[in-house]
Swiss-Prot record:
Family that this chain belongs to: Belongs to the TRAFAC class translation factor GTPase superfamily. Classic translation factor GTPase family. EF-Tu/EF-1A subfamily.
Species whose genome carries this gene: Aeromonas salmonicida (strain A449)
PANTHER family in alphabetical order: ELONGATION FACTOR TU, MITOCHONDRIAL, ELONGATION FACTOR TU-RELATED
Gene: tuf1
Subcellular location: Cytoplasm
Annotated spans, G5: 174-176
This protein's name: Elongation factor Tu
Region (G3): 81-84
Length: 394
């Protein structure tokens, strides 16, 4: 393959395979890379290259993840695949691999299984916006009615968790046959790729979203005023614009009178940049780490939310013992810890290290948050859990 085929100017989209163990997620991942490499160039990955997933650490949690990439005519995709169920749980909750859309793999020979359901639920909780279904192993099912039945079951399950089950794309294929080079089944991989291109919208870039910067530090500069520093998470702030300081205390409105980076003055600060923002009429003691600087009205402070949490195992450096209702750890958001209490789901008395659990958290001070915000749970500075805000309550 000639080298110059690979262009970085295509839109970039993050996807991944999810679904029950042994339903063919890794085989499908290999098949996609092989079939698309034939058609559009790029690297083909073999099954065992993907299956030997390297260990990564995200917020102190050990996760095995394989990353592959592939191209279609119009897009470049980064694709994650995990070997084990626990890796999926951790990956989705920590946001180690943010997905703009997921390919749910369901074996036609089995239909939906317990982890199929759990991955759909997790996808809903952590805010994966789009699902495409790949019904795998269809070469092993001769009965058309059985295929219809499995498809119906999967669609109903997705609808149950608020995905548009009736409308989302379902592809019937055989990852193994496609990987072996069977042209008819390769066609199904192309069909899947077409759905990726058309069903998952191009993700909004961080720079196009409303301005937000978590405040890391606050300085007072004689004769100039108060400067807050941090890395711009999203959007752009221009000199002269009104911004809000949100979280911990009452929301305050102020004007950004200067932006500097590496001691140079700029007209604006953009997503991804580490900046200092000079704020008009704000006292040093009125601002603190853990608040955010944001476009007015774009984000609100909250104290109560439903979350999905993964509790670190003892081996990962987490707790050695379970915790119970009334547990009061620190919740670390962006740049600071806030104490909070938890409510466990009905019928759940305790949570063991290594579990994942839905819990309602009430913080003692408000934090600027939206659904999808990630956090860590800490005890005395050591991380014992990772979570994501599934939905804000108050």
């Amino acid at each position: 393959m000639s080298k110059e085929k690979f262009e970085r100017n295509k839109p970039h989209v993050n996807v991944g395979t999810i679904g029950h163990v042994d339903h063919g997620k890794t085989t499908l991942t290999a098949a996609i890379t092989n079939v698309l490499a034939k058609h559009f160039g790029g690297k083909a990955f073999a099954f065992d290259q993907i299956d030997k997933a390297p260990e990564e650490r995200e917020r102190g949690i050990t996760i095995n993840t394989s990353h592959v990439e592939y191209d279609t005519a119009i897009r470049h995709y980064a694709h994650v695949d995990c070997p084990g169920h626990a890796d999926y749980v951790k990956n989705m909750i920590t946001g180690a691999a943010q997905m703009d859309g997921a390919i749910l793999v369901v074996a036609a020979t089995d239909g939906p299984m317990p982890q199929t359901r759990e991955h759909i639920l997790l996808g809903r909780q952590v805010g994966i916006p789009y699902m495409i279904v790949f019904m795998n192993k269809c070469d092993m099912v001769d009965d058309e009615e059985l295929l219809e039945l499995v498809e119906m079951e999967v669609r109903e399950l997705l609808t149950e968790y608020d995905f548009p089950g009736d409308d989302l794309p379902v592809v019937r294929g055989s990852a193994l046959k496609a990987l072996e080079g069977d042209a008819a089944w390769e066609e199904k991989i192309i069909e899947l790729a077409n759905h990726l291109d058309t069903y998952i919208p191009e993700p909004e870039r961080a720079i196009d979203l409303p301005f937000l910067m978590p405040i890391e530090d606050v300085f007072s500069i004689a004769g100039r005023g108060t400067v807050v520093t941090g890395r711009v998470e999203r959007g752009i702030v221009k000199v002269g614009e009104t911004v809000e300081i949100v979280g911990i205390k009452d929301t305050v409105s102020t004007t950004c009178t200067g932006v500097e980076m590496f001691r140079k003055l700029l007209d604006e600060g953009r997503a991804g940049e580490n900046i200092g923002a000079l704020l008009r009429g704000v006292k040093r003691e009125d601002v603190e780490r853990g608040q955010v600087l944001a476009k007015p009205g774009s984000i609100k402070p909250h104290t109560k939310f439903e979350s999905e949490v993964y509790v670190l195992s003892k081996e990962e450096g987490g707790r050695h013992t379970p915790f119970f209702k009334g547990y009061r750890p620190q919740f670390y958001f962006r740049t600071t810890d806030v104490t909070g209490t938890i409510e466990l789901p009905e019928g759940v008395e305790m949570v063991m290290p290594g579990d994942n659990i839905k819990m309602v958290v009430t913080l003692i001070a408000p934090i600027a948050m939206d659904d999808g915000l990630r956090f860590a749970i800490r005890e005395g500075g050591r991380t014992v859990g990772a979570g994501v805000v599934a939905s804000v309550i108050a």
